[in-house]
Amino acid sequence: MQFSTTPTLEGQNIVEYCGVVTGEAILGANIFRDFFAGIRDIVGGRSGSYEKELRKAREIAFQELGEQAKALGADAVVGIDIDYETVGKDSSMLMVSVSGTAVKTRR
C-alpha cells in the first residue's frame, strides 16, 4: 500500500477512485500527565516518551487507513491529511486522524 500527501503518484496513473478512507488513534490522559510531570525526560527541549507515543498513534491511524483502502480494493491512498486534535474533558486526550482518497493505480 502506497501513501502520499500529494493528489497523484509519480510514474503511475490513477485508474479508479475507490472512496475516502480514514484512520484515528487517541492517546489517553496518562500520556499528558506523564509528559508534564516527567520533565526529566526532556532532552534538548524534546520529550522522547511523548514523541514515541505520538509516533505509535500515527502508525495506528495509518494502519487503519490502509486496512480501509485495502477493503475497497485500492493499492494506494493519495491526498492524505494528518491532523492532531485535543479531545475529551479538559482536552485531556490527543487524537491523531488521517484521511485520504483510496485509489487503484497502474504504471
Curated annotation (Swiss-Prot):
Source superkingdom: Bacteria
Protein name in UniProt: UPF0145 protein CKO_02237
Species of the source: Citrobacter koseri (strain ATCC BAA-895 / CDC 4225-83 / SGSC4696)
Family in the record: Belongs to the UPF0145 family.
InterPro entries: UPF0145_dom_sf (IPR035439), UPF0145_YbjQ-like (IPR002765)
Gene3D superfamilies: Hypothetical protein apc22750. Chain B
